[in-house]
């Protein structure tokens, strides 16, 4: 038997300040992030000696990680002018109506959010595999893994964006009541009016929520940074605890000395993932959204007196996801040729989806996501000098059930960013020039068109799909004393596409993206000692 122990400690510190409005205007003056991640892991394995018809391995794994995130997000010097332009000067009108200094309160430089998020995550698992060599050509494999995962998460934000803190429904409600001589800040006057005029009061409540009656509601789109309800709190404990038993079964058969056939069935598990961003929101089961003046009804957070203006429901976390994968394949090798092919059928229940919305990230579970397809890879040494390779994945991914995504009901639609066809093809020719070992290589990377967004509205804005059709080439040599020189070209035919697209920060109806790397050429020199 062999005992193996692996102990690891890793620490990662990231500090950055991004110009995240991606314009020449100073709209977002500061988008600073500092993230610290400290991770400790311990793994122990005991493996059999390999004698006899049964091989086995048992082990355990421990994981302890702490994440601390500090963010600062402030408006820049041009943000007020930008907001005035979008609103047609309405911000100044609201400031005047509220008897505030005009031009000096809303959307000011330096207003924004100071954020603090983090989590402590501990997990452990015990696992084992057993290979039973039933005959010289048939092997059955069984694997088991039991995991427990616990997380303690937190999030707090100090918000200085005055305009986003306004309850525009309540302001419209107060203005309407004021027309009847009722002071909306006096509960006694409001109750007396409602009792004496129930029909008129109901109409005022309804009108406060109707943009046709309350024009202030048209400004809600400019409330980019609404107040945040920190957690844990008296209703939300910020904790999750998950456990699961996963397993794998595999049967392999050496049909000949050159051909192996196999079939496997496996399950997988991913624990709860917390949304550690400003878009974290209470679940609908904990909070019923709505301005207090509209009588939204009872909910745990409102009843506990925790509700803040403009709070909406959403998700604090995505619950566990569970996967099932069936694979049937063959591996063939003969002389200078090798060919592998596998059919796979994967289903993920509760797929954890994370989508950037322009001001934060929406984390939610899809009911079910699946994909079926083929994986193929082959290599052929045509001669001693020439090697050809090919690898490809051909699949049909779909959201089987995703009725409550951040982009509406996506059930039956293909997920964005996943190509139906992905291939990699290469040719390498090696040869000697006197004492030099030289080579010439070319490769082609292809990914079929796929949508940038799950959201149909954003996809319609960008107007095209992501497709990759990139050629690379290189040539080089190595000397007897270990000096290597490689001349290379990447994307030599200048394939032009957007690698990633996303909603622009605080600019509804606009999109941003990162372009592909243009044709690039260079030389790499290395020395082995």
Regions flagged by a language model, labelled:
Residues 1, 44, 52-56, 136-140, ...:
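Outer-envelope beta-barrel architecture signal
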Residues 1-10, 15-18, 33-51, 57-68, ...:
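Outer-membrane beta-barrel transmembrane strands
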Residues 2-8, 13-20, 254-266, 270, ...:
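Membrane-embedded beta-barrel scaffold of Gram-negative outer-membrane proteins
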Residues 7-9, 58-64, 142-148, 263-267, ...:
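Transmembrane beta-barrel strands of outer-membrane/channel proteins
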Residues 11-17, 64-72, 148-156, 257, ...:
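Gram-negative outer-membrane beta-barrel proteins
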Residues 20-30, 72-116, 152-239, 275-316, ...:
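Solvent-exposed loop segments that connect transmembrane elements
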Residues 73-74, 80, 385, 445-457, ...:
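C-terminal beta-signal and adjacent terminal beta-strands/loops
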